């Protein structure tokens, strides 16, 4: 998937992130301000792996292993806080971490940002559980979870916020100590904003400075239930579903529904409703002219349905088999989960074997450096693609071929102005608020060209 190239380019572009929001050594050397518009903090370990090992492909894979391990730890910790039962916590950790949709994000879509955001959803679930139901003084867990998602994937932040708002509306009537719990939710919101300000403020500042090319919304449409059931039963990871293992857990939860408390039932039916919303039975057409269109793909909801169903499934499995030899039974379910996980991944690889692209370690850095990504450029650049794609430089109205040198923090352009007068140099370099340029060591002002790129006057 081209998202692999995108994230590899992001990784190598973090080598100067503490000194500059722009790196000229990635995204085809056009000076994309990616680190302002796409959160990077939780990606930074991947860059550290790369610096230690010097192998971009290996570092990328180790980072996914690290995130998978972290997902297991966060899931176990979150469920342990909710249920105070290590067996339920272990079951939830395994079921959620090796859920089909998370595997699809990693292996089929290469959607690293969303996959990492899934790591922190259990923490947000636990934070909401404390505020809504139990010890509202532990509201800080919600802030920690939300902040980590903010520094990972902005669309996931929007989706989580909608879920928090929806569950607040549905559950508020049943709360005790309503004022105290609302204040705790407000505290969590305020703290999240302050903790996230390092990303949010520059993001808002640059977004307001000019009209940008951003990922477009798409016509929203769910999957036909018959198709969804077929893909689930086939454990097909080429299509975006919750997978066979969670589906079996969903059926089991309906059969043993009396094992669930009122709180568990709320989470379970929330998962069922979200799964229903991912089908074409839900009237998504009504939202195609609203901000909801930014969701782009309805199947993104599977991350949330996987969370809620995995929560319920772990409880049901435990209470069905809560006799002796719990460790042995957990091992059996772990084995089953891993078998279905591996079969789904291997089937997906086999089905796509003719279209797979293998990135050799020795080629990875060059591929990442030269990958051209046009999101977050000035919107006007959409109408002049040749300027970017062909690296065109114009001195006045004449195309020239200057010598260029790229460093992480700096792009140097060498040319002679033979016009003997001030002439405008138009470059294929993106322009953002705060850009610094100099000619022969003297600071000069830059402007936004009619092509949506940087221009400056050469004496």
Language model segments and positions:
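Membrane-interface helix-loop junctions at the exits of transmembrane helices
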Residues: 14-22, 88-109, 195-214, 266-296, ...
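Periplasmic/ER-lumenal interhelical loops and adjacent helix-loop junctions
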Residues: 182-185, 189-255, 369-372
């Amino acid at each position: 998937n081209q998202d692999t190239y995108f994230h590899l380019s992001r990784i190598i572009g973090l080598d100067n992130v503490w000194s500059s929001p722009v790196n000229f050594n990635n995204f085809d050397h056009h000076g994309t301000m990616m680190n302002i518009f796409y959160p990077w903090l939780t990606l930074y370990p991947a860059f550290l792996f790369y610096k230690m090992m010097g192998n971009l492909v290996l570092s990328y894979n180790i980072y996914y292993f690290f995130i998978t391990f972290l997902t297991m730890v966060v899931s176990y910790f979150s469920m342990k806080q909710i249920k105070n039962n290590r067996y339920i916590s272990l079951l939830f950790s395994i079921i959620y971490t090796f859920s089909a949709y998370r595997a699809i994000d990693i292996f089929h879509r290469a959607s690293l940002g969303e996959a990492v955001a899934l790591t922190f959803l259990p923490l947000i679930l636990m934070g909401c559980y404390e505020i809504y139901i139990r010890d509202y003084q532990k509201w800080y867990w919600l802030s920690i979870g939300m902040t980590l998602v903010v520094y990972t994937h902005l669309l996931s932040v929007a989706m989580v916020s909608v879920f928090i708002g929806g569950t607040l509306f549905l559950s508020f009537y049943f709360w005790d100590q309503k004022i105290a719990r609302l204040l705790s939710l407000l505290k969590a919101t305020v703290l999240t904003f302050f903790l996230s300000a390092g990303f949010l403020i520059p993001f808002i500042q640059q977004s307001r400075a000019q009209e940008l090319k951003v990922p477009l919304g798409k016509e929203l449409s769910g999957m036909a239930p018959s198709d969804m059931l077929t893909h689930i039963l086939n454990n097909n990871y080429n299509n975006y579903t919750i997978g066979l293992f969670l589906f079996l857990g969903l059926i089991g939860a309906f059969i043993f529904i009396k094992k669930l408390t009122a709180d568990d039932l709320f989470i379970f039916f929330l998962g069922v409703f979200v799964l229903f919303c991912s089908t074409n039975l839900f009237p998504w057409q009504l939202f195609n002219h609203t901000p909801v269109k930014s969701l782009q793909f309805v199947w993104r909801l599977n991350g949330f349905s996987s969370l809620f169903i995995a929560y319920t499934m772990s409880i049901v499995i435990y209470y069905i088999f809560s006799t002796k030899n719990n460790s042995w039974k957990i091992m059996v379910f772990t084995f089953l989960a891993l078998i279905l996980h591996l079969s789904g991944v291997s089937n997906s690889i086999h089905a796509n074997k003719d279209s797979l692209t293998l990135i050799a370690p020795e080629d990875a850095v060059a591929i990442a450096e030269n990958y051209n990504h046009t999101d977050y450029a000035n919107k006007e650049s959409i109408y002049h693609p040749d300027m970017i794609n062909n690296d065109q430089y114009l001195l006045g109205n004449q195309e020239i071929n200057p010598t260029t040198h790229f460093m992480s923090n700096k792009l140097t352009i060498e040319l002679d102005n033979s016009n003997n007068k001030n002439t405008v140099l138009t470059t294929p370099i993106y322009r953002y608020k705060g850009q610094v340029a100099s000619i022969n060591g003297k600071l000069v002002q830059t402007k936004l060209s009619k092509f949506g790129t940087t221009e400056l006057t050469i004496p």
